[in-house]
């Protein structure tokens, strides 16, 4: 077992020293999650690496189902399904639950067409040999990591039989902070993965990436802002279409 500690100032390293079977890679510098991932993958020698989050629960067959997908040599990454636990009818829980059902369906359809577009950190796996070191300031490490594998010519398989169950955001404020981080990470990803915007090189993957991700993170916010004044102008114009049955 290997533990990666990143700038921890508690007694983690001291306590782990009592277990000789545990390897501890400690860095006193706070490099962040991506830096820790880079260090961890530097010592991993298994052909497949499965990623998950500490706050998620996997179904019992999850790992076996994910590994089975790699029987196809064209698959370089496998994305599991994220499910939101205890979703109600109001607030952050309902909003997040609906979004992930929609997102999961898109991934399933993308997979049927050619390749899923990215993986969520709650559950995904990669071929170790295809991992590329990420820049330490990468915000969406799971998405960028998986798309860099797709850029090498491998498919991202979607496995709905393997799922990770996660509790929803506590409130709309927490959900708002998470969405802001994803939005910022999305813009960063579009720039850093700009080579995927070449339709002549990436073909179907280009279409999937642009329609599913790039437009959502770049054009959609602009369109939403433009819709407000356009709707106000339409309202004030008294256009008969507003009152048509």
What are the roles of these predicted feature ranges?
Residues 1-4, 23:
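Hydrophobic targeting segments
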Residues 5-13, 29, 56:
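A conserved acidic beta->alpha catalytic loop
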Residues 13-17, 33-42, 146-147:
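Short, conserved alpha-helix that lines the donor NDP-sugar binding/gating region
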Residues 21-24, 155:
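Conserved beta-strand segments of alpha/beta enzyme cores
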Residues 26-29, 34-36, 42, 46, ...:
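Long helical/loop segments within the catalytic core of UDP-sugar-dependent glycosyltransferases
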Residues 70-102, 137-141, 146-212:
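Catalytic donor/gating beta->alpha subdomain of glycosyltransferases that bind UDP-sugars
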Residues 109, 113, 213, 217-221:
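Loop-to-transmembrane-helix entry motif
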Residues 166, 216-245:
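Membrane-embedded multi-pass helical conduit in multi-pass membrane proteins
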């Amino acid at each position: 077992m290997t533990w990666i500690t990143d700038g921890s100032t508690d007694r983690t390293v001291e306590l782990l020293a009592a277990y000789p079977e545990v390897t501890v890679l400690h860095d006193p510098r706070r490099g962040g999650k991506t830096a820790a991932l880079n260090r961890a993958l530097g010592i991993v020698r298994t052909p497949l690496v499965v990623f998950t989050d500490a706050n998620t629960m996997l179904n019992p067959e999850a790992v076996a189902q994910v590994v089975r997908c790699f029987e196809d040599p064209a698959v370089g990454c496998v994305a599991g399904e994220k499910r939101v636990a205890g979703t109600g009818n109001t607030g952050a829980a309902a909003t997040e639950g609906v979004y992930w059902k929609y997102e999961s369906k898109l991934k399933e359809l993308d997979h049927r067409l050619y390749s899923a577009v990215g993986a969520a950190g709650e559950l995904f796996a990669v071929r170790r040999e295809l991992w590329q070191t990420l820049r330490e300031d990468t915000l969406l490490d799971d998405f960028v990591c998986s798309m860099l594998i797709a850029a090498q010519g491998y498919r991202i398989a979607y496995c709905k039989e393997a799922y990770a169950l996660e509790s929803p955001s506590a409130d709309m404020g927490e959900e708002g902070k998470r969405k802001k981080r994803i939005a910022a990470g999305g813009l960063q990803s579009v720039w850093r993965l700009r080579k995927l915007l070449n339709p002549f090189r990436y073909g179907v993957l280009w279409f999937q990436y642009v329609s599913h991700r790039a437009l959502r993170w770049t054009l959609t916010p602009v369109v939403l802002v433009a819709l407000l004044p356009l709707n106000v102008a339409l309202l004030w114009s008294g256009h008969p279409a507003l009152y048509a049955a």
